[in-house]
Amino acid sequence: MFRRSEKFSTDKTAQELRTKVLPLDQLARTIESVRKSGQRVVLCHGVFDLLHVGHLRHLKAARAFGDLLVVTITGDDFVNKGPGRPAFPSMLRAEMLAELEVVDFVSVVEEASAHPSIRAVKPDFFVKGNEYADPKKDISGKIVTERELVESFGGQLVFTEDITFSSSNLLNRYFNVHDQSAREYLADLRQTDFESQFNRTLDRIEKMRIVVVGETIIDRYVYVDAMGKAAKENIIATLYRDEEVFAGGVIAVANNLAAVCPNVELVTMIGDPAAGDNQEDLIRKNLAPSVDATFVYRPSGPTVQKTRFVEPTYVRKLFEIYHMDDTALPRNVQDSFRGLLSDKLAQADLVVVCDFGHGMIDAGTVDLLQKEAAFLAVNVQSNAGNIGYNLIDKYSRCDFMCVDAMEARLAVRDKHAGLPDIVTRRLPDLVDCRNFIVTHGRSGCYVRKGDGAVCIPSFGGAVVDTVGAGDAFFALSAPCVAAGADCEMAGFVGNVAGAIKIGIVGHRRYLSRFEIQRYVSTLLK
């Protein structure tokens, strides 16, 4: 089955190659030369993260369709199976495949689909496992476009029928991908039909009309290298390297909501164009195309900006500067804002409020939201700019509330309070709400379920950047509850969103429905 040498013999062209693993452009030239001899070329594509007997049988069956078998694998940065995947880097996966006698060539594709490899190889047969035979069961939707592309080159999409294993299932069962609490929780969840329930919930969310309200925040990352203590001052000197500017705050929430719902309206506050660059062009450029935005302009004030000075190697924040005017909006601006907000609330199935405490949402706006929202989901944030002044009890009622542990403890004025007691008793005493979730970083989240609390463990891998993780959690959990799911499902999905987000620097990209579904599916295998 396995060979010690990478040298092999199929024809003259192949004998001249020094290795089976080729860059995609070189593979294309090699296959073009091979095809001239009349050989039929077969292509398989996948992640092949943990090579197993199911893969071997699939590859042997694929080889039977032609004379030459090419296997392409998805590059590490494009594997959408959740944090911690792939378990093995692309070159190790490629090396393992190349050692199989049945495989003639291997290449790594730096894209999330098989399209580049299909274009390069132009296979006579593109072979997939029988789990892809029904296009409706392919949550990525790629099998349809891949079939069309293969057929455009005169090839044919075919399926193998044999024993089926899952690399994700094997990794989950036999490798310590998650800690003990997560493994036990997932083992119980696998005994239910959670995944199908979740997919039905997504289908309901897709039909909703969602209005998002909150402040836009510009997140600026200034990358610097620490040089050491300044000679004459008690400060650390740094060397400027680069910077990135992201549209964050409520923009991130709206964009993440747009991943699961095409009907998202946004009402947000930004700075006065007359007062300088209010970053409106950047904001509009970064909004998801399906998000319909309405801007409220703060007279004479800037768009809220948080500049973080960051050590780039490990994305460690050194210090932060706020640029903002967080005083209450002038009466005429507030009245105009409430008028347009009232019109939008009347048409919304779900109203998502991201209250960052920077002056947009006052008591009058809270009253309007509580009276007119059909389903009100609220996140009231405590941050360095408002600590102690923006607590959840500014809302007397809502339908779903999501805060982190510090925000919950501030609200109940007890820094040592147990989170289960906060979720089940103390928060409901403050706010008339049936659905509470309190997030707790690596410890997961606590959700109110019946008269008790359930702890849902976190699933994240290595933490790259925590900025926006709570917003991603809220953006996915809120519509789940509004669509009829219980808080346990909402908390699970929120943890999935947060786990994906902590692997992304700033807001370089937002979540997609496909990666959320794929990660849920991966966890439950």
Predicted regions and their residues:
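Glycine-rich phosphate/adenosyl-contacting loop at the front of the ribokinase-like
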Residues: 185-265, 457, 461-464
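Conserved phosphate-binding/catalytic loop of the ribokinase/pfkB sugar-kinase fold
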Residues: 295-301, 306-345
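Substrate-binding N-lobe of the ribokinase-like
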Residues: 235-304, 519-521
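Histidine-anchored nucleotide/phosphate-binding helix
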Residues: 52-68, 245-260, 365
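Conserved post-catalytic alpha-helical subdomain immediately downstream of the catalytic base
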Residues: 432-435, 459-523
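Short internal beta-strands
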Residues: 68-74, 129-130, 265-270, 376-380, ...
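Nucleotidyltransferase catalytic core that binds NTPs
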Residues: 1-190, 525
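Conserved phosphate/ATP/ADP-binding segment of small-molecule kinases
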Residues: 350, 363-453
